[in-house]
Amino acid sequence: MMTKLEELVNELCPDGVEYFTLEELGTFYGGLTGKSKKDFEKGNAKFITYMNVYSNPALKLDVSDVVTIGENEKQNCIQYADILFTGSSETPNDCGMSSVLTEYTDENLYLNSFSFGYRFNNPDKFDVIYLKHLFRSHMLRKQIVKTANGVTRFNVSKAKMAKVQIPVPPKEVQNEIGKTLDNFTELTAELTAELTARQKQYAFYRDYLLDFSNEDVTKKIPDIDCSNVEYIKLGDIAKFTYGYTDKAKDYGDTRFIRITDILDNGYLNPNDAKYINLNEESKKYLLSKGDLLLARTGATYGKTLFVPNDEKAVYASFLIKIELDNTKILNRYYWHFSKSNLYWKQANKLVSTAGQPQFNTNAVSRVVIPVPPLSVQENIVKILDRFDKLNNDMSEGLPAEIEARKKQYEYYRDTLLSFDDKACSHIVKVERERERERERERES
C-alpha cells in the first residue's frame, strides 16, 4: 500500500523536481538602517533580533525588543513567508542561519541591521513549514556556507546567496514533507519538555542556593552558611584576556575553541571542531582543564564554558578567558553562578544590544557575585554538580534519547529534501519506515 507522500510524488513529479536559484524566485532586502543607540532605548515598534533569527527555524513573534520608527521613515517590514538570514558570524558554518515567518501578524515587525531578509515574488507557491525545514537542511546549509567571505569575521555575500539553488516541488508535496518532518520535531519537543522540567528543578535549586539573603537555605541545608558572604564585582577578583586571532581550519594540531563551541548548558560542543597549528604566539593562549571562557559577542554572548579536559586547545578572539583569584572564589562555583538568574539579570542589562550583542570586559567586570567562604562554595558545587549530571550527561537518560531523536530527524529531513535521481525511492523508503515505527508504537 502506497503512502500519501508516495502517491503525491508519483502523480505530481514523476520525473523529478525542478531547482531554481533564489534570484529567480525573489529578492533580498536589508535590516534597519540609520539607527543610533538612542533609537533602541524606547521605541514604538518591535524588531527581530539577530539571536531570534539565529536560534529559531521558525521566527518567534513574542518579542519585547523595540526601536523608534519615524512617521514617514522608510524601513523594511517583515512579511509572512519571508526568510530571514544572519549576515555574519565568527565562522562560515554559522553564517546565513535562517528563520521563516510562519505566522500571519498585523504588527509591523522590523529586522536588526546584522541580518537581512528574502521575499518570494510568489509566496503562495510555497509552504512555510517546508521552507522552515528546507533552509536548515544539510543540502542548503552546504550551499549557504560557501557564500561567506572573511578571515576572522565572515560575512554573507548576497551576490553569492542569490545563486543558491532550492528544490521547488508542487505545493502538495511540500505540505506533506512539512507535516512529516514536523511529526519528528514534535516527538523531540515532548522529550525536550520533560528535560526542561528537570532543568527548571536544577535552576530552582541553583538560584535557591545562591540566594544568600534567604535564611531558609541555612535552615534546610546545614552545610550552607549565609552569614559570611561578600558581594564582589567580578573585575575585583578576576583577570581578563582576549583570545587569539587566526583562521579556523578543519585540520591542525591544536583545537581552536570559538564562541559557537559553547552550548546552552555551558559545555563544550563535541561536534564541528576546528583547529589551528600551534606557534610561539598562539602558545600564550593554551588552555587547561577547569579554565573559564566567556563568549563576548553574538548569539552566545554571556555564556561561560568550563574547559572539560586537558585536550590541547587555544581560544579564539571572540572569547575572553576569566582567571579568578582562587583564594576567593572557585572556578566551578563561578561557572554555576554564570548560569543563574542573578547572573543573567545583570548580563542582560550590561550587554550592548543595539546591533549584534557585545559583552566585553568593561561590562562583565561589573557583574556582582555573592562570594561565601570556600568551604561553602565547595558544598554548593557538590549539590549542583549532581543535578547538572542528570540534565546534561549525553551518554544516558533523556539527553541521550533527545540526541538520538535529533539525529533521526536530520536523517529523514536530508533524505526527503535531497530530490536527487533516487528521490522517489528515498521518500518511499523513509515513509514506509515511519509507518512501521508508528505501528510498533501502537502495538507497544
Label each region the model flagged.
Residues M1-S444:
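Charged, alpha-helix-forming regions
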